[in-house]
Regions:
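C-terminal regulatory/interaction module of P-loop NTP-utilizing enzymes
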Residues: 1-189
């Protein structure tokens, strides 16, 4: 709820840079990053790059949410994807065994709710900058309906642990079809 993904996707994004985004869980598969075969419509199969390889090929931005939730399968691929671009390469498990290298401009931003020490040292070391985001991005607050922006700011000032901006957006949406008291009961209790 503080807008980490919002900031990761939009902050300092060059005009034509593509963004590829995923949210990891313990059950996420490396195929999400590397790729896999899909039916081609003619009874055969064709290779489909995962978002990590797409970001490499285009010099795009790869946003990895909840990186600290990555399982062993994904973590093994992250070591390669996050390696120094001057030496990074990955041989795809496709028919041609193609070797892919990151195109100039490739960048990775990872988010997590934990602390950097929650990551394996070799992964944490691949991020030269670590930023603690403990306030909501102003644009995220501005995305709330005007009548809720003040209420959110008041909640932020009064509560030790404020409700996430996501909860306030859900409240705003429910308030369109339900009485405010019912929407508040559903979202905030």
């Amino acid at each position: 709820g503080t807008g980490k993904t919002h900031q990761a996707v939009l902050t300092n994004l060059p005009k034509n840079k593509q963004v590829f985004q995923t949210t990891l869980t313990a059950d996420s598969s490396a195929t999400e990053l590397v790729g896999h075969y899909i039916p081609d419509g003619d009874g055969g199969f064709e290779w489909n790059d995962g978002i990590g390889m797409k970001a490499w090929r285009t010099g795009g931005r790869l946003v990895i949410n909840e990186i600290d939730h990555a399982g062993i399968d994904v973590m093994s691929v992250l070591y390669a994807i996050l390696d120094d671009p001057s030496v990074a390469k990955f041989t795809l498990p496709n028919q041609s065994k193609e070797t892919v290298k990151p195109k100039k401009g490739f960048e990775v931003i990872a988010t997590m709710n934990g602390v950097p020490q929650d990551l394996p040292e070799a992964i944490a070391d691949r991020f030269s900058v670590k930023i603690n985001i403990d306030t909501v991005h102003p644009e995220a607050i501005e995305s709330l309906p005007e009548n809720l922006q003040y209420a959110y700011s008041k909640n932020l000032a009064e509560d030790e642990i404020p409700m996430s901006i996501r909860a306030w957006k859900a409240f705003a949406k429910l308030s369109e079809t339900l009485p405010v008291s019912e929407a508040a009961e559903i979202v905030f209790h």
